[in-house]
Regions:
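C-terminal hydrophobic helical "lid"/dimerization subdomain
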Residues: 3, 244-248, 290-342
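Short Gly/Pro-enriched turn/cap motifs at secondary-structure boundaries
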Residues: 7, 18-19, 51-57, 74, ...
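Glycine-rich beta-strand-centered segment in the early N-terminal region that forms part
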Residues: 20-34, 47-91, 133
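Short glycine-centered segments of the SAM/dcSAM-binding site in methyltransferase folds
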Residues: 78, 164, 254-255, 281
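NAD(P)H dinucleotide-binding glycine-rich loop of Rossmann-like/cofactor-binding domains
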Residues: 89-168
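Mid-domain Rossmann-like dinucleotide-binding core that forms the NAD(H)/NADP(H) cofactor-binding site
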Residues: 136-215, 220
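Glycine-rich cofactor phosphate-binding loops and adjacent beta1-alpha1 units
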Residues: 157, 205-280
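C-terminal substrate-binding/catalytic core of Rossmann-like NAD(P)-dependent dehydrogenases/reductases
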Residues: 223, 227, 264-313, 321-322
Length: 342
């Protein structure tokens, strides 16, 4: 079978790899669509994975082989799912903190998502595989993973109808957050970014106000407008300098949600008095638990997520390198790129 294989930041090869065999409790799917995530791009550009790795985790496909002990799925089923599965028995799992389970990151699909065929191990079949509803395309279904991650992230903080929320970053993740927030009837969603291309799209995804922080001082602008500040700030861009800025525009008692890994200068200074006097807080959020996938699929199915506008490009699986380059150069109106295997 063919796969897009990582050998270096400028070396992605579409080549033959071994097609996985499955056991009696496993499933093989033919990958039909796999979304390109910012995490994939970060791993490629920073060369954080071994040479010969297959990336990709936002997958959807058709079951083409079923182990004889699998009873809940059949040949031809259209499915989507995640990559990490908790044990469900440890202390973290018993408290509902599934993404903190020691076994969580040890589990994965094989060999990755940017490949013609994916093997789903027993734990994925049992806990992290979902049938795609009729009428939902494979490309739409591939959005279930990032939507589920955003749902998980928003559960890390109390968000109420009538709240004012700032989303820092107008990429696909920030725009998904915006739509989920609007579905919660928040009073205001403000989105910041340094790209006019992306900010021009943001109103289509629920933003009430957009601010280009490349040429506008956010704190000064809000003060001049008499803005009361935000109940919640979601950082959806991996830039550590955003964290002090987020803290400064929070209301007293507000919370910053660190959704993205800080890939640029992760060490920073923050005025610690805000934690005591103003009861401001910071929470982190990582990945997704199995239960948020069902919510994500329903959100897509019910039109909470504008999939047609979010997916701006569909490209052949062989063009992964081109897709990464297209996302990075930011000269086009690029939001979500989905790699197709047809």
């Amino acid at each position: 079978m063919k796969a897009s294989v990582f050998y270096g930041k400028d070396d992605i090869r579409f080549e033959e790899v071994d097609k996985p065999d499955i056991s009696d409790k496993e499933i093989l799917i033919q990958m039909k669509a796999c979304g390109l995530c910012g995490t994939d791009i970060h791993k490629v550009t920073e060369e954080l994975v071994p040479s010969g790795s297959v990336l990709g985790h936002e997958y959807a496909g058709e079951i083409v082989a079923v182990g004889k002990e699998v009873s809940d799925f059949s040949l031809g089923d259209r499915v989507t799912g995640g990559i990490h599965v908790p044990c469900f028995t440890c202390k973290q799992c018993s408290r509902g903190h599934y993404t903190l389970c020691p076994e969580f990151k040890k589990t994965n699909i094989h060999p990755g998502g940017f490949v013609e065929y994916i093997k789903l191990p027993e734990e994925h079949v049992n806990h992290l595989l979902y049938k795609i509803p009729d009428g939902m395309s494979y490309s739409e279904a591939s959005l279930a993973e990032p939507v589920a991650c955003c749902i998980h992230g928003q559960k890390a903080v109390d968000i109420y109808a009538g709240d004012r929320v700032l989303v820092m970053g107008a990429g696909p993740i920030g725009l998904i957050h915006s739509q989920l927030l609007k579905n919660k009837l928040v009073k205001e969603v403000v989105i910041t970014d340094v790209s006019d291309h992306r900010l021009n799209n943001a109103h289509e995804f629920g933003a009430d106000l957009t601010i280009n922080t490349g040429d506008t001082n956010l704190e000064m602008y809000l003060q001049e407008q008499g803005h009361p500040g935000f109940d919640v700030v979601i950082i959806a861009a991996g830039i550590s300098a955003l964290l002090p800025q987020a803290m400064n525009v929070l209301k007293r008692g507000g919370t910053v949600v660190c959704f993205s890994p800080f890939t640029v200068k992760p060490v920073m200074e923050i005025d610690a008095s805000m934690f005591f006097h103003d009861e401001k807080s910071i929470v982190g959020t990582y990945s997704v638990s199995p239960y948020e996938f069902e919510e994500a699929i329903l959100a897509i199915q019910n039109g909470v997520i504008n999939t047609e506008a979010l997916i701006t490009h569909e490209m052949p699986l062989a063009d992964l390198g081109k897709a990464i380059e297209l996302t990075q150069n930011k000269t086009e109106n690029v939001l979500k790129i989905v790699l197709k295997n047809e």
